[in-house]
């Protein structure tokens, strides 16, 4: 409706000196002309420019209809065909295919002639198909991409397929063949069709103190989001709906209302679907196509290791807190380090270590820390006037051992953020659904097993790394600081995609760092 109103107002705001904008409507009302004749005449003057089409769009339309000898795509004798009616419905729901509504040209008013509707439908279909294959955000510059159209020849070729498949199906076939993209595209479409696209943000403060029953605020929110039917409600169905909702939002499906569940309930389905559109857009522009690589999706809390184009291992991870966010990066894993030293980042030294030392100097010995000057000379902490310090002027190094914050193994790759993938003494955190607890590094579950798999596949042709999985086991047993350099450096991609899917399910993970929010503001022209 917003699109229709905008366009309707546009017609009245056109300046009188812009020609005769009403002529296109006079032309389209002429019953003495065939659709083909009307289309031919439309392109002979500036009828379309006068109602908001730019020259590129007009030239594109001319080319499209020239290929078709001015035969309409969606109309016959000025009446929508079945294909036309179904396609019009498809274009009313671009978010079902992962394309934000703002990417479409303002649609003609429903009362306008079907032939004019067709012209708008062609442009919007061309825009959608271009975005589905090329993306709508430039993630390097963090700017919206300009609206573009697929080539007229490719457009007509695709439109010919509408005799055998629907426009919905045609849109779903666009984009990369990547399995993750295919699963997300299909499951987003299914979610869109199954759940009402509510725009309501619920204020569910203190809802965790209310009983879970049919009259609760929870049940009203669940009905609005399509997880409950208003008829035949029962307390059991409310609980079952809550568990399904939690599962779809990357939370533990335990029926317990905690902070993360409340945050997910407060978010509207409309916003979740918009986040899914951004996730699809990121996948379609991804450059991950190597034979061997590691990818880490921060909001999903998972590490994926691939070798020989096959998924070898999936490991749960812990990522950085909101105040110590894990960065997105691309690098190459060069070595595996057993029993690593940990050089504590300067920010942690200042914010955490220095106050703890001032409180009790035994903090250093209890945590196996040593202090060094810039020339690597060790400092006796008992001879430092800690109370007088406002900054931490030394290097703080934690000695290797199972007590070490990096655990017994780390995977090293060059980056400007001083982050790694590593083990952790805090194994219990892997059992949580939302796992943002670190200082920015990525803590990995079962990292030794991951290291052994990497070494098992570390070869150039038939020449394998002389250090084997058994070698790593021996190093761990010896509890000595040792390094294994990889024969083949492994590309690693750390990225941020909040919405994911497998074959059967879509999951809307929390936008823990509000990075999707930044792109949503950009799409709605609210970016600073």
Predicted regions located by residue number:
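Well-ordered beta-sheet/strand-loop patches within structured domains
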Residues: 18-53, 146, 172-252, 259-528
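Sec-dependent signal peptide recognition
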Residues: 2-9
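Cationic-aromatic interfacial patches
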Residues: 18-156
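Short loop/turn hinge sites at secondary-structure boundaries
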Residues: 98-99, 107-110, 131, 135-139, ...
């Amino acid at each position: 409706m917003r699109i229709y109103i905008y366009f309707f107002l546009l017609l009245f705001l056109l300046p009188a000196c812009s020609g005769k904008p009403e002529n296109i409507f006079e032309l389209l009302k002429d019953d003495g002309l065939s659709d083909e004749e009307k289309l031919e005449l439309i392109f002979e003057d500036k009828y379309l420019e006068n109602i908001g089409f730019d020259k590129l769009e007009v030239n594109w339309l001319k080319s499209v209809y020239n290929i078709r000898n001015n035969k309409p795509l969606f109309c016959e004798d000025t009446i929508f065909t079945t294909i036309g009616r179904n396609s019009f419905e498809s274009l009313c729901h671009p978010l079902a295919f992962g394309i934000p509504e703002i990417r479409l040209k303002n649609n003609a008013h429903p009362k306008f002639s079907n032939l004019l509707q067709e012209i708008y439908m062609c442009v919007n279909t061309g825009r959608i198909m271009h975005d589905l294959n090329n993306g709508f955000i430039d993630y390097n510059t963090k700017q919206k991409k300009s609206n573009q159209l697929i080539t007229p020849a490719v457009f007509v070729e695709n439109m010919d397929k509408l005799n055998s498949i629907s426009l919905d199906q045609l849109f779903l076939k666009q984009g990369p063949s990547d399995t993750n993209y295919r699963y997300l595209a299909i499951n987003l479409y299914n979610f869109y069709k199954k759940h009402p696209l509510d725009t309501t943000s619920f204020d569910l403060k203190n809802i965790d103190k209310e009983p879970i029953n049919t009259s609760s605020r929870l049940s009203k929110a669940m009905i609005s989001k399509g997880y409950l039917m208003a008829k035949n409600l029962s307390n059991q169905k409310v609980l079952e709906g809550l568990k399904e909702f939690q599962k779809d939002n990357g939370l533990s499906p335990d029926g317990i209302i905690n902070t993360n569940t409340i945050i997910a309930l407060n978010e509207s389905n409309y916003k979740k679907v918009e986040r899914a559109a951004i996730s699809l857009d990121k996948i379609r522009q991804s450059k991950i196509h190597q034979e061997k690589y590691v990818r880490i999706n921060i909001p999903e809390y998972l590490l994926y290791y691939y070798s020989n184009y096959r998924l070898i291992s999936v490991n749960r991870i812990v990522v950085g807190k909101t105040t110590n966010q894990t960065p997105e990066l691309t690098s190459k894993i060069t070595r595996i380090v057993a029993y690593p030293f940990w050089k504590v980042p300067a920010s942690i030294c200042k914010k955490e270590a220095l106050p703890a030392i001032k409180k009790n100097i035994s903090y250093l010995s209890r945590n196996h820390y040593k202090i060094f000057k810039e020339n690597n000379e060790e400092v006796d902490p008992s001879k430092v006037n800690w109370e007088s310090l406002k900054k931490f002027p030394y290097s703080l190094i934690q000695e290797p051992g199972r007590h070490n914050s990096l655990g017994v193994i780390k995977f090293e790759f060059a980056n400007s953020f001083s982050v790694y993938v590593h083990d952790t003494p805090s194994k219990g955190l892997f059992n949580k659904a939302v796992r943002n607890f670190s200082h920015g590094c990525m803590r990995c579950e079962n990292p030794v097993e991951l290291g052994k798999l990497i070494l098992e596949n570390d070869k150039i042709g038939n020449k394998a790394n002389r250090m084997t999985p058994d070698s790593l086991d021996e190093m761990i047993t010896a509890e000595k600081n040792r390094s294994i350099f990889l024969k083949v450096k492994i590309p690693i991609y750390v990225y941020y995609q909040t919405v994911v899917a497998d074959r059967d399910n879509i999951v809307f993970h929390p936008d823990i760092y509000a990075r999707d929010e930044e792109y949503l503001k950009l799409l709605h022209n609210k970016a600073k």
